[in-house]
A protein has these predicted regions:
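Short linear elements at protein peripheries
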Residues: 98-150, 158
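C-terminal catalytic lobe of FAD-dependent flavoproteins
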Residues: 135, 141-144, 151, 210-224, ...
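A conserved short coil-to-beta-strand element within the FAD-binding core of flavoproteins
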Residues: 161-175
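Core beta-strand elements of the Rossmann-like FAD/NAD(P) dinucleotide-binding domain
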Residues: 184-193
């Protein structure tokens, strides 16, 4: 159901397991293609003391940039220092940690800059005279998902797109699954183990279809992006601080455009039909106008997209916690009371490979 089930296939087929992937729509048609398209450690997660997550993501960033340079590339980010936001010493400390939490060979480190003389300072308002530069990576997120699925198929996995898992029956030693395509053709599959990698649908699939339970729950957060005609003509991206504490990126996009996002809003609507609303567009335009000389308005938006992030929480966690403070890490829940089922809660695109590795390590004993 996307976020994305194909992310783990690369590791599964290498261990010679027989795999059927069931995707109710198309590959990467939901959350996986609605990211900010970054391979990054998550600089802002340091404020929440998520050092382990950041370190893991930084290690994965290095691995991914080496393994798929045709769909990923290094990207330098400029953070203008806004005197009304985080103090300079805090930013320096955070960037120092970001540079040193994991071994870094491919990317240059961070440093301070004068925006009066730096190329990236030209498009910014005069009030921003100092800033910081650091490194992360860009990724074609949808293509990454599709490439994983293609590689799995080439090694024997069966990839069934536009095919929903409509029912499962659990026995002591196996599952029986009923799969239905969009043209109403049905397929019956028997499996020794079921992996629930349904992203935003993982909790509902576990409860409604598998009839299982877990001590985890998903908090669904909508993230929206806007695309406007390019606001700058250089290869740097920007990371902006909003007065509400959130971080928003402005990234070169498809040569002629600038991608701006993301928002963080609790979502209770239809996960199959997610779209940006007027307040989100205004939010992103206003933040852009706070930093850039060239003002934009909602009428300048040439495209927008939205996705739902499945953030994992313990069942008794407070839903009133700020969405930005909820972890972007993942949790794996293996139920072996009868035929085993592994449910994946949460996750981010940067750590997809590590998640898959840990998931297959967890289920490997089932196959002796």
């Amino acid at each position: 159901r996307d976020r994305s089930p194909s992310r783990g296939l690369g590791d599964v087929y290498k261990r010679q397991l027989s795999v059927v992937l069931c995707e109710k729509d198309d590959l990467a048609s939901h959350t996986s293609s609605a990211s900010t398209k970054l391979i990054h450690g998550g600089l802002r997660y340091l404020e929440n003391y998520e050092f382990s997550l950041v370190r893991k993501a930084l290690i994965e960033r290095e691995i991914l940039l080496r393994s798929a340079p045709h769909i990923m590339h290094p990207l330098r980010f400029v953070m203008p220092h806004d005197k009304g936001q985080r103090p300079a010493w805090m930013i320096r400390a955070g960037l120092f940690l970001y540079d040193h939490l994991a071994k870094r060979e491919l990317l240059p480190g961070s440093h301070g800059i004068s925006l009066r003389s730096h190329t990236a300072g030209g498009p910014l308002k005069e009030e921003f005279s100092k800033g910081f530069v650091y490194s992360d990576g860009w990724v074609n997120d949808a293509r990454l998902v599709v490439m994983n699925a293609i590689a799995a198929a080439e090694n024997g996995a069966h990839i069934l797109t536009r095919t929903a898992c409509v029912a499962v029956t659990r026995h002591a030693d196996q599952w029986q699954a009923s799969l239905r395509s969009q043209d109403n053709a049905e397929v019956q599959v028997e499996a020794k183990l079921l992996v629930n990698a349904a992203g935003p649908w993982a909790a509902s699939f576990l409860h409604d279809t598998v009839h299982g339970r877990s001590g985890k729950k998903l908090r669904l957060i909508k993230g929206s992006h806007i695309v406007v005609w390019k606001l700058f003509d250089h290869p740097y991206a920007y990371i902006f601080q909003h007065p509400d504490g959130r971080i928003v990126f402005a990234i070169p996009y498809e040569q002629d455009f600038t991608l701006i996002g993301t928002t963080d809003i609790d979502y209770h609507g239809d996960t199959d039909r997610v779209s940006i609303d007027a307040s989100e567009i205004s939010y992103l335009c206003e933040l852009s106008n706070h930093y850039f000389k060239q003002a934009i308005s909602p009428s300048d938006v040439v495209w927008s997209y939205s996705g739902v992030r499945p953030l994992v929480e313990d069942a008794d966690d407070d839903d009133n916690e700020n969405a930005s403070a909820v972890t972007r890490d993942y949790k794996l829940a293996l139920d072996t009371d009868a035929a085993p089922v592994l449910t994946i809660f949460g996750g981010k695109i940067t750590t997809f490979r590590k998640l898959a590795e840990e998931a297959v390590d967890l289920i490997a004993p089932v196959f002796n």
